[in-house]
């Protein structure tokens, strides 16, 4: 077994028998030799045939390592992969997604030659009809492509950008040095993780190459509404407010994120019960949030218009609209 690699690809896996082979094959079809990178698959208690599919493929490649654990969720599986990784840089890849052919050398060279803590790259969204859509934040990153910035400067310049973990490469020593692990048991782990680790980084860069394909399934976990989802939303909102104070130079970026999460919370809570709604409204009151200003999308502008009159008015109005006009259910 090799002591160190250039890259570690960490793939958490749970019940993805329909997609894991595509994901693994994309990681194999690369332009680094097998002794230069490793693929770590974390079987997070899968109950389908995912594990047998991976084990069959792993028999053919010495750089594929499989670790099984009791189901602990996405963050737990990512942390397990991180703890076992030996690469200079780590790429966290979701098991129903796939990466572009022959991108590993490009990513490693960009990260290592610029001595980066974090590298961000472009990605596609692919729906179940195999329609591809470019990441909408590409235009935002264009002015800073191939420019090495501090984490603070980078964060200030990417207002409107989705902080999607698989679209970043992370230097392992940077994560270890600061004990940057994923928060377990929450839904919005990508935002929580990246808003914690990007601002304090010394060297961050974006490159324009499309390296990743995000598969958007209709039954995505982020589309399910439950009280736990609202509790997680309240948790991440509180964290973002704290980080706006800690990283005050990035106030505009955190304001945009906070306002977006408030709008999302109002939309979700409009379908929830009174206890769920009270929980979310109390979080807003506790943090003295009364107005929404920094939103861009039409759905958020409509939501903010109602919210700025009164949060309860926003909840009741959106609930009425979504139930009275079914087509709005998919637009708000």
What are these regions (language model features)?
Residues 5-8, 26, 38, 192:
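Cell-envelope/extracellular polymer assembly enzymes that use nucleotide-activated donors
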Residues 16-30, 53:
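Short, well-formed alpha-helical segments that are part of the catalytic scaffolds
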Residues 43-52, 70:
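A conserved acidic beta->alpha catalytic loop
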Residues 69-85, 95:
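Glycine-rich, basic loop-to-helix element that forms the pyrophosphate-binding segment
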Residues 74, 95-205, 215-225:
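Donor-binding/catalytic cores of nucleotide-activated saccharide
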Residues 90:
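Short aromatic/hydrophobic "clamp" motif used to bind/position activated sugar donors
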Residues 209-217, 223-249, 264, 272-290:
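Catalytic core of nucleotide-sugar-dependent glycosyltransferases
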Residues 273-332:
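Membrane-interface aromatic/basic loop that binds lipid-linked glycans or pyrophosphate carriers
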């Amino acid at each position: 077994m090799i002591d160190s690699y250039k890259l570690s690809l960490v793939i958490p896996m749970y019940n993805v028998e329909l997609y894991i082979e595509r994901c693994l094959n994309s990681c194999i079809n690369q332009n680094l030799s097998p002794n230069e990178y490793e693929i770590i698959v974390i079987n997070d208690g899968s109950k389908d045939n995912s594990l047998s599919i991976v084990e069959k493929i792993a028999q053919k490649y010495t750089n594929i390592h499989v670790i099984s654990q009791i189901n602990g969720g996405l963050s737990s599986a990512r942390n397990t992969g991180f703890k076992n990784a030996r690469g200079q840089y780590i790429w966290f890849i979701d098991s129903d997604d796939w990466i572009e052919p022959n991108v590993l050398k490009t990513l490693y060279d960009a990260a290592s030659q610029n001595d980066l803590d974090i590298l961000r790259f472009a990605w596609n969204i692919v729906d179940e009809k195999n329609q591809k859509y470019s990441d909408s934040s590409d235009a935002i990153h264009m002015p800073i492509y191939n420019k090495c910035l501090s984490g603070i400067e980078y964060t200030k310049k990417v207002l409107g950008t989705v902080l999607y973990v698989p679209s970043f490469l992370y230097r392992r020593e940077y994560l270890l040095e600061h004990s940057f692990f994923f928060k377990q048991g929450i839904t919005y782990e990508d935002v929580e993780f990246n808003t914690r680790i990007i601002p304090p980084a010394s060297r961050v860069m974006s490159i324009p190459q499309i390296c990743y394909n995000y598969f958007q399934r209709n039954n995505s976990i982020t589309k399910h509404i439950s009280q736990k989802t609202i509790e997680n939303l309240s948790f991440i909102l509180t964290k973002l407010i704290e980080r706006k104070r800690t990283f005050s130079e990035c106030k505009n970026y955190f304001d945009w994120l906070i306002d977006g999460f408030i709008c999302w919370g109002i939309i979700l809570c409009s379908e929830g019960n009174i206890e769920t709604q009270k929980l979310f409204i109390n979080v807003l009151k506790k943090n003295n949030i009364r107005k929404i200003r920094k939103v861009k999308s039409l759905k958020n502008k409509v939501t903010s218009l109602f919210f700025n009159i009164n949060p309860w008015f926003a909840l009741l109005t959106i609930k009425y609209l979504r139930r009275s006009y079914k087509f709005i259910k998919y637009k708000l």
